[in-house]
C-alpha cells in the first residue's frame, strides 16, 4: 500500500518537529550557521575556566541545532525511503552531521591537554556541573584519543563508514523484491519484510517453509554483494579500533559505555551453560507439533494448537496500558498522550523501513515506527518500543541536553521491562489453559529470540571480526559457514537447513557493531526488575533509573534499579526462569 492511501490517524505527526519542509530548510540553514562559531574555539579551551565553559556551551548549542533537522530527515526517510526528496534530505542532514563532527574534533584532545590539576579545580564550579560526567568520560578515554588532526580525519571518515549500512538499507528496504509465496488460503501473494514474520508463524508447515525458503533463498542470491557491504563495515570497525589503540573492535565498541569485555564473555558463557535447557525446549516443541523431526522453519509457529490470538492495534494499546499499571499514574498519562498525539506510525507501507524502533526527539517527544500486522508479537513490539519512548521522555524532561541521551545497554532494559510486564499481565488474567499455554510459549520465544538468539548474533559478530583480524576474507561462503556452525551449536538436535546459512545477511543490526548483545543483557535485567516490581509493588528504583539518561555509565545506572551486570547472577537467574517455564509449559501440553 502506498503511504498516501493510509488513514492519517495511524501515521506519526512530524509537524511537531517542523510544520513543513520549508521549516526544515530554514532549520538546516540555521544549523549550518551554528557551525560558524565553532571555528573560533580551537586553542581557547585551556586559557581560562570561562573560556572552557563558553566552548562547551557553544559546542552543545550547535549540536542541538544540527541534530533536530537530522532526526526529522531520518524519520521522513524511514517512513518512505522510495521518495527521492526524503533520500535527499537524509543525505544533506547526514553531511551536516559529519561537518559538525569534524568541526568539534578538536574538543577531546584539547580538553586532555589541560593539566589535570587545573581541570579538576575548574570542574568543582557549579556552573560546569552539567559537564562533569562528560568531561570525566573524556579523561577516561585519554589513552584512546588522538591528536586534533587525526581526530578530524576520523570524523571525516565517519560519512564513508556509514556507506555499507546505507547501501544495505537501500538494497533491502527499497530495491530488493521478494518473490511470490502461498498464504494460508492458498493464494499467491508477494512476500514482504512485514508479512514474513506472519507466515513463519503459520499453522501450515508448507506456508512457513515456503516463506522461509523464499526469504533466505532471495538473500542467498545477493549474498556476495551483502558480504561485501558487511565486510566493509567490519573493516571500518577494525580500522577505527586500531587507530585508537584498542586490542579489538569489540573492546572499542564496549569501552564507549565503560563496559568491560568480560561482561560480553560472561553472557556468552552463561548462555552456553544453559544450552541443555534449549535442547529441552526444542524437544518440547517437536513433541507438541507432532513432528518426527523439527527444522529451523518450525521455530516460530506457536506450539499450542487451535488458538487464534490476533490482536488489533486498538486492543494492543489497551493491553499495554493495563500491563504497565504497576509503573504508576504518570506513566499511564504519557501512554495516553502517545496515542492521542500520534507518536506512533502504525502500519506497513511501500518504501517504509522494516521492523520497529523508537526515536527520542529532545524538546519535542519520542516517535515510534511500527509495521503492525495484528499478531501477539506485534502487541509485544508495541510495548517494547513504547518502553523506549517513555525512557526517552523521562530522561529528556529530567536531564539537560548534555546528559539526556542514554546508552543502548540501559535502553534495552526499559523496553523489555514492558514486554515482561505484558507477559505477566496476560498470564494473570487468562484462565483458558490453551491460551495460557500460548502465552507461556510466547514468553519462551522471547527468551529464545532475545536472550539466546541475540547472544548467537553476538558470537557471530565476534567471529566475523576475528576472521578479518586474522587476515581471512569475509566472503559469503565464509560468513555462511560461521553462521551455520553457530546455529548447529545453539539449536543442537534439530535439522539445520542450509537455507538458514544466509540469515546473517538479513540482520540490519550487524552494521552497528557489537550492539545486539545488549538485547540479551537487557532482557535478563528486565526479567529481574519486573519480578521485583510485581512482588514488592515498588517501582520507585526503576522509575528513578528511567530519569538518569546519560548522566552516568550504564552499569552504574542499572545499579539504581537493583541490577549488577558485572556478575553473572542476573543472566543465570533469567536462564533459570527459562528452564522453569519450559517445565511449566510441558506440564500443560504433554
Name each region found by the language model:
Residues 1-306, 587-590:
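A well-structured
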Residues 4-6, 19, 107-114, 133-140, ...:
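C-terminal, non-catalytic "cap/extension" segments appended to globular domains
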Residues 363-383:
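Short pre-active-site segment immediately N-terminal to the catalytic Zn-binding motif
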Residues 367-371, 398-408, 437-446, 465-467, ...:
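Short beta-alpha connecting loops at secondary-structure transitions
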